Design a protein with these regions (language model features):
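N-terminal leader/linker segments that precede catalytic domains of diphosphate-processing enzymes
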Residues: 1-74, 79-135
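NUDIX/MutT-family hydrolases
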Residues: 139-163
Length: 163
């Protein structure tokens, strides 16, 4: 079974992301119960094969501005707009706006558990997409300072990230 097939079918719980939360941040499931009207948002995790058949994803570094997410390393994404039919659409639209990945590129694989982002009161849902080849990207300089390709192997083995 390849990674994508495995990932499609693995059982995930609501709090599987907890080990990655910053120290002191409340569990998302608990925080969401106490928050009033968190804003829906979505990010796209675009996975693709790179050198030697290894899988990679993109991160972005947000541009510097007078906002709460200035300069952050993140997945491309943002808030749901009133005319977005659903959050998958939001993830695709935001990825197109920020890094130029066409809204029709990438096979939708699955969503991951929503995470509460306290600084902006976002309930953020990650959506995972697979591409047969590395997608062509063009970053929106107003929103994105740089696009950072990252091999999944470097995450698994905690290797230094080169960009």
């Amino acid at each position: 079974m390849d990674f994508i097939s495995y990932f499609k079918h693995i059982e995930l719980t609501e709090d599987d992301h907890l080990p990655m939360l910053p120290m002191g941040r409340a569990r998302s499931s608990e925080a969401l119960k106490t928050m009033k009207s968190p804003r829906e948002s979505a990010v796209g995790i675009h996975c693709f094969p790179c050198a030697a058949g290894k899988l990679s994803i993109f991160l972005i570094q947000r541009s510097e501005y007078q906002g709460k997410h200035s300069g952050q390393i993140a997945f491309p994404g943002g808030k749901m707009e009133a005319d977005d039919p659903d959050l998958i659409y939001t993830a695709r639209r935001e990825c197109y706006e920020e890094v130029g990945i066409s809204m029709h590129e990438g096979e939708y694989i699955r969503s991951l558990s929503p995470v509460y982002i306290p600084v902006s009161n976002f309930k953020m849902t990650p959506y995972f997409f697979y591409h047969e080849t590395q997608p062509i990207t063009i970053h929106n300089e107003r929103e994105v300072q740089q696009i950072i390709p990252l091999s999944l192997e470097s995450l698994a083995h905690q290797l230094p990230i080169e960009h």
